[in-house]
Amino acid sequence: MGMRMMFTVFLLVVLATTVVSFTSDRAFDGRNAAASDKASDLISLAVRGCCSHPACSVNNPYFCGGKR
């Protein structure tokens, strides 16, 4: 194999590695965003549950629609 051919193979390997790394990173970011949305939903459910109890809503007026 000549030097030019070896260099071409090297470039192809680097390109393939970059493409695989980039696509797997984007998929990972999507999973993180989904987990973050799920956490936000759980937090909002917990806050709504707190607001339905008078003692909790008095202690957390900012979350339950009251003035701070």
Curated annotation (Swiss-Prot):
Signal peptide range: 1-21
Keywords of this entry: Acetylcholine receptor inhibiting toxin, Amidation, Disulfide bond, Ion channel impairing toxin, Neurotoxin, Postsynaptic neurotoxin, Secreted, Signal, Toxin
GO CC term (a single one): extracellular region
Expressing tissues: Expressed by the venom duct.
Compartments where located: Secreted
Propeptide: 22-48, 65-68
Single GO term (MF): ion channel regulator activity
Ser-Xaa-Pro motif, crucial for potent interaction with nAChR: region residues: 52-54
Disulfide bonds: 50-56, 51-64
List of residues that carry Cysteine amide: 64
Major subcellular location class: secreted
Superkingdom assignment: Eukaryota
Function in brief: Alpha-conotoxins act on postsynaptic membranes, they bind to the nicotinic acetylcholine receptors (nAChR) and thus inhibit them.
Family per record: Belongs to the conotoxin A superfamily.
Domain notes: The cysteine framework is I (CC-C-C). Alpha4/7 pattern.
Protein name (record): Alpha-conotoxin-like Lp1.2
Lineage: Eukaryota, Metazoa, Spiralia, Lophotrochozoa, Mollusca
